[in-house]
C-alpha cells in the first residue's frame, strides 16, 4: 500500500493513456532519448503497421524534442491494437506534461496544438465502450427472428 502512494522522483512526469480496456502508463524523465515499452525498445514493436501508429507522436513532434528525455511505458489489458493506441496517447500526454512542468509554456502549447490538429485522441481518451449483450438476441442489438405462424 505504501509503495502505491510514493511520489515519483523529481524531474519525472507520469501520464497514462487509455483505449477500451488497455491502459498504458508512461514515466518520462531526463535522459538520452530512449523509449521503451514493457522493457523493449519501441523500434522493436511488431507488426510494422502498429509500430508506425505508436511512432506517430514522435514523428509529429520531431525526434529533436525526444532527444533529451527517456520514456518507460508499461501497458496492460486490451488487445494489440488497443494497446498501441493507449501507448501513443501515453507518449503524447507525457511529452506535453513534461514540457509544461520542466520546459516552457510556449513550447508546450506548440506541441499540444500539433497533436490536437493531427488527431484529438492523442490527448483525449475515446469514451466508446463495448455494449453488453441483452436477452432475446445474439448480440447487443440483434434480435432473434420473429415468427407469427
Swiss-Prot record:
Tell me where on the tree of life, at the top rank, the source sits. Eukaryota
Gene for this chain: RPS16A
> What does the sequence similarity comment in the record state about its family?
Belongs to the universal ribosomal protein uS9 family.
Main location, first listed in the record: cytoplasm
Q: What would you give as a GO molecular function for this chain, any one?
A: RNA binding
Q: What is the recorded name of this protein?
A: Small ribosomal subunit protein uS9
UniProt xrefs under PROSITE patterns: RIBOSOMAL_S9
Q: Which keywords appear in this protein's UniProt record, sorted alphabetically?
A: Cytoplasm, Ribonucleoprotein, Ribosomal protein
Q: Does the keyword Transmembrane apply?
A: no
Q: What's a GO biological-process term for it?
A: translation
What is one cellular component GO term in this UniProt entry?
cytosolic small ribosomal subunit
The places in or outside the cell where this protein is found are:
Cytoplasm
Q: Name one Pfam family in it.
A: Ribosomal_S9
Q: Where is the organism placed in the taxonomic lineage, from the top?
A: Eukaryota, Viridiplantae, Streptophyta, Embryophyta, Tracheophyta
Amino acid at each position: 500500500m505504501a509503495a502505491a502512494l510514493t511520489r515519483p522522483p523529481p524531474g519525472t512526469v507520469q501520464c497514462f493513456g487509455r483505449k477500451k480496456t488497455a491502459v498504458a502508463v508512461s514515466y518520462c524523465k531526463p535522459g538520452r532519448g530512449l523509449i521503451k515499452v514493457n522493457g523493449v525498445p519501441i523500434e522493436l514493436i511488431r507488426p510494422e503497421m502498429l509500430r508506425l501508429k505508436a511512432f506517430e507522436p514522435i514523428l509529429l513532434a520531431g525526434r529533436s524534442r525526444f532527444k533529451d528525455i527517456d520514456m518507460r511505458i508499461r501497458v496492460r489489458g486490451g488487445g494489440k491494437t488497443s494497446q498501441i493506441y493507449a501507448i501513443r496517447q501515453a507518449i503524447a500526454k507525457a511529452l506535453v506534461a513534461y514540457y509544461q512542468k520542466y520546459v516552457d509554456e510556449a513550447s508546450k502549447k506548440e506541441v499540444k496544438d500539433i497533436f490536437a490538429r493531427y488527431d484529438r485522441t492523442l490527448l483525449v481518451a475515446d469514451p466508446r465502450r463495448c455494449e453488453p449483450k441483452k436477452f432475446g438476441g445474439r448480440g447487443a442489438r440483434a434480435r432473434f427472428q420473429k415468427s407469427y405462424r
